[in-house]
Amino acid sequence: MELSEGNLQGLTEYLKKTLDPDPAVRRPAEKYLESVEGNQNYPLLLLTLVERSQDNVIKVCSAVTFKNYIKRNWRIVEDESNKICEADRIAVKSSIINLMLRSPEQIQKQLSDAISIIGREDFPQKWPNLLTEMVNRFQSGDFHVINGVLHTAHSLFKRYRHEFKSSELWTEIKLVLDTFAGPLTDLFKATIELCNTHANDVGALKVLFSSLNLIAKLFHSLNFQDLPEFFEDNMETWMTNFHNLLTLDNKLLQTDDEEEAGLLELLKSQICDNAALYAQKYDEEFQPYLPRFVTAIWNLLVTTGQEVKYDLLVSNAIQFLASVCERPHYKNLFEDPSTLTSICEKVIVPNMEFRAADEEAFEDNSEEYIRRDLEGSDIDTRRRAACDLVRGLCKFFEGPVTNIFSGYVNSMLQEYAKNPSVNWKHKDAAIYLVTSLASKAQTQKHGITQANELVNLTEFFVNHILPDLKSANINQYPVLKADGIKYIMFFRSQIPREQLLVTIPLLIAYLQAESIVVHTYAAHALERFFTMKGAATTTLIVAADMMPYVELLLANLFKALSLPGSTENEYIMKAIMRSFSLLQEAIIPYIPSVISQLTQKLLAVSKNPSKPHFNHYMFEAICLSIRITCRANPAAVASFEDALFLVFTEILQSDVQEFIPYVFQVMSLLLEIHTTDIPPSYMALFPHLLQPVLWERTGNIPPLVRLLQAYLERGATTIAASASDKIPGLLGVFQKLIASKANDHQGFYLLNSIIEHLPAECIEQYKRQIFIVLFQRLQSSKTTKFVKSFLVFLNLFCIKFGAIALQEMFDSIQPKMFGMVVEKIIIPEIQKVSGPIEKKICAVGLTKVLTECPVMMDTEYTKLWTPLLQALIGLFELPEDDTIPDDEHFIDIEDTPGYQAAFSQLAFAGKKEHDPIGEMVNNPKILLAQSLHKLSTACPGRVPSMISTSLNAEALQFLQGYLQAGSVSLV
């Protein structure tokens, strides 16, 4: 694509169409842009539109399209072609910083994000001048430009907070510090000075405080991994100014908005974060500054209001106190009982209160409320911070803290008892305080795993939680109902089984509660109960416990999916899945109704899949229905196919990318249940499964390979008879997969099924080409993973077609190649093969090479016979060699760039591991002994002679053990 006016105009028109609400207009435009994004100059055309277009909408659209293009294509992935030519890469990097800094804020943010994506891949090696170019702009004096640089630097450096330590990372951080830390500190001081100069100019202050907020964020990123020498030397400058900013109260920066945090609140909360980082990680160096920060942050907490806009600030301020009180150095600051009482009264209790804003979220934004309250994303909430502070204080002062707080709990409960309808929030706070006091350690899987022994959890449950849950009106006091359910869910590992069983019928009833939060918590609690471990391998709650409730449980779970706001509630669907798994055969009488409802739901959500977890659990539930029913009655598979295939056809024809990998897995499960030949409905689909477009999507590959394996296992004769013209297509898929380091193992799965199941005459003409393809890959890109799979394939081929066929195949491609493979690949690498079935295949195959291949005894290959036997005994007896060469790395599926529906393995569609040898060989060691005995009988004297002269003593001892176990000897 040339950088021409015509192309700019054409691109403008297509970008306009991508904004059209009509899918008939929008989708073709999106497809067109997708089709041309591989052309040279495409990114430069987008940047030209960002710079020159007169239409602001097109400018923004171009910037967003450019950022997404960079996100999808900039990373160079091994095995894949470079999606952006080198000339475009150089041109983009040479122009983007200038363009970003000249652009308005809305566009600047998009381009800044694009720079950080490029920097993540190219900085510092391929973009060494990036930082210098950015730092030079600090001198401009233009804070629009400076903030653009700071925003980009923040995007670039914030990953330092999350990355594991490595020499490579530290080298990069050192380079950044050498170039950036000094100018950043100078800018910090200059900006503080300007704030003092312009203290009465609200416009200037807004720009300057935006800069200070970004500078404070950069400070956090650059100090996160370790305390850099530069910042240690300049701690006085940074900490003094941070402290001054914490205590600053400029009325001009206060906002009337009760929801949205202002610039001053954002800056102060970031400073609290920075102080907490230093208190936790660099307490010795930070000690001189700590008392003044504790005082400033305490004053901040007792003077800040309850408005939502202060939530982040208060949360970070409390988290600072929590991190300080956990350190042995500082415990003397908190040990006075009056201090503990003051903290409880002035910080913890006020910030545990259920505010009007929380009530509003509970009722009107339940999804967000659940996410924060149940899933632990409440990291920035006042309640979570107050809870963390309670736990922190309990580390050194558990007894005094429990006594003080118990008094508050009793007082709150008494207030509630006086007038429940008015004072229910007191009980809510009491439950939250008890939960905070009692929980010392928690996991997602088990709830609270370690509790404060000074708190009697069961007594509190019986006296204060159970009465609420037993209330006849399931819709009264919904917040307290949710609190009660959450309490028993959190402390399920501490509460006796008998009490849990009492709550099960109550929870089933709460599935019908009007409140989304309440019926969601009920579903989640049931699901968690059903996964609790009991004695040995059983669950704590077993199917027999649930027998009185099966019908009501299933009915209420499915009814809950029709309640307003819960039509795609992932917790309910997960509870359905877990109920099926626990109840097993008990659900069979309800399957016709259940599968009908699941199918209707599948059809509805396939129109616009938006809840990935819900969708995943739905497919798991479908798989469980199939497995449980067909285990008892395999013929029932036909009724599932009747119910599901219409919806599956719709999904495949509409190309619902998110669901296609799931559909293939369910179809594999159904096909594997068939015991006779493949039904015609499957054979009609077979040619479509080989279409290249399906294999372009990474997420389709594992389930598609499994589905093709199911076709080969169940219907090889049908394929050979009526679809032999599709065998080249099958091998084409194998060839594509084998060329990829990420997917070569999938290629071998498919190839092994082809070799094992298709009649020999069907693949005779292709065998040589298969070996050539494998050798080309071995020569161009040898990896441990490939070699392991290659060895399994060779031995499977040997078992299927015989050792002579294997040797002749190699030597027909190139003379003496068989010897090279045995010497250079099989003998040195066989120890790397892992997995019992894979090892068994290799053992049987190598036994055949040793004992059924005449050239191993009578030609120059004879010198390899004993080393090969030694290697086979090593495979039996030595630990697996799991070393991987230093220079080798594997590309994971997750690393493929851009959005692709990732493959999600369905646990309940799991494939039983297939053993191609099966009962033919139970003990490969005995097989080796018997085969050597047979060989030695055919050529007396030779085998004992070869073994005694070349096999090492330890291997010889093992071999004698095999011969003894097999009741045979060598002659």
From Swiss-Prot:
Single GO BP term: protein export from nucleus
For this UniProt entry, the molecular function terms from Gene Ontology, in alphabetical order, are: nuclear export signal receptor activity; small GTPase binding
Residue ranges occupied by any Importin N-terminal domain in the UniProt entry = 29-102
Where does the UniProt annotation locate this protein? Cytoplasm; Nucleus
Which Gene Ontology cellular-component terms appear in the entry?
cytosol; nuclear envelope
Q: Which Gene3D superfamilies is this protein grouped with?
A: Leucine-rich Repeat Variant
* Family designation: Belongs to the XPO2/CSE1 family.
Name of protein: Exportin-2
Organism of provenance: Xenopus laevis (African clawed frog)
Q: Which gene encodes it?
A: cse1l
